[in-house]
Amino acid sequence: MIRVIIERHQKEAKKGELIHLLRELRASAINQPGYVSGESLASIDDASIVSVLSTWQSLIDWRNWAKSETRAKLEKQIEPLLTEKPKVSIYQVMATE
């Protein structure tokens, strides 16, 4: 299982638009093979930062979603709402036992 964290820095006046598109992105991801869960997080220290944490069964599942046409279309709409390119970090879930 893997977790993907995508950190986005939004433009000041674009928060509502970004949140709407992130909801659309998650609604589309739910239908993807291997998708487990996702949530959006707002930084307490910097109001311009919105991060999305998603969990996938495998790296292959994430990569298939990452290169999908559906995701690309939504990311293209999100891009102008940001001050910089999103930072994507991928983590392997470690055994905790």
Put a short name on every predicted segment.
Residues 9-18:
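Short, surface-exposed ligand-recognition loops at beta-strand->loop->(often short) alpha-helix junctions
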Residues 2, 39-46, 76-97:
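Glycine-rich beta-strand-turn "strand-cap" elements at beta-sheet edges
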Residues 30-37, 55-89:
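An amphipathic, aromatic/His-enriched active-site/gating alpha helix that lines ligand/cofactor pockets
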Residues 2-8, 39-66:
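Short, well-ordered beta-strand segments in beta-rich or mixed alpha/beta enzyme
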